[in-house]
């Protein structure tokens, strides 16, 4: 279930809140949970016009989500690789961004094993657990809600 967030400012790094942009986090996470290609495509369109400081992580995650919805195996793999390159590039540029690491954890937990994209789960889980209390409240709520159905996150939150 998606939380009813309003549009919020998402810092590009936890330590540098001056570098931020507006993204409709509620719509983004709703599309991430959805099986609707229409919702996912709408988010991809929105993200394509977002500023570069957050665009690649969110766009990469959404493209990987699209890969999981449908199509032939070759096109799904191509989309997944394209999204992975964007997300991993964003994390490499901003490794202290807990939300980027959360996006990767969501994808890695739910990606088919055959893709071999599971190697950062422990590291990301530990980083998210360590950073959780300093994150914006609406992001904490999003993560806590995901934690309820996650088999790997294991946050101790009420």
Over which residues does each language-model region extend?
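Short coil/turn linking the two alpha-helices of tandem helical-hairpin repeats
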Residues: 31-33, 65-74, 110-115
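Helix-turn-helix repeat elements of alpha-solenoid scaffolds
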Residues: 30-44, 75-84, 117-118
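TPR/TPR-like (Sel1-like) alpha-helical repeat modules
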Residues: 78-85, 115-134
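Terminal, low-structured helical/coil segments at or just beyond the last alpha-helical repeat
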Residues: 122-158
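TPR alpha-solenoid repeat register
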Residues: 55-56, 100
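Residue-level recognition of tetratricopeptide repeat
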Residues: 52-53, 97, 135
């Amino acid at each position: 279930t998606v939380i009813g967030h309003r549009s919020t400012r998402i810092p590009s790094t936890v330590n540098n809140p001056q570098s931020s942009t507006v993204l409709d986090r509620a719509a983004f996470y709703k599309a991430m949970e959805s099986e609707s290609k229409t919702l996912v495509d709408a988010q991809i369109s929105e993200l394509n016009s977002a500023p570069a400081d957050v665009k690649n992580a969110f766009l990469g995650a959404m493209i990987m989500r699209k890969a999981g919805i449908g199509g032939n195996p070759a096109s799904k793999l191509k989309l997944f690789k394209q999204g992975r390159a964007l997300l991993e590039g964003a994390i490499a540029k901003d490794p202290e961004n807990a939300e980027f690491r959360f996006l990767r954890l969501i994808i890695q937990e739910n990606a088919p094993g055959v893709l071999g994209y599971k190697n950062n789960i422990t590291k990301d889980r530990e980083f998210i657990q360590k950073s959780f209390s300093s994150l914006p409240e609406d992001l904490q709520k999003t993560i806590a809600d995901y934690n309820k159905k996650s088999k790997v996150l294991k946050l101790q939150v009420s």
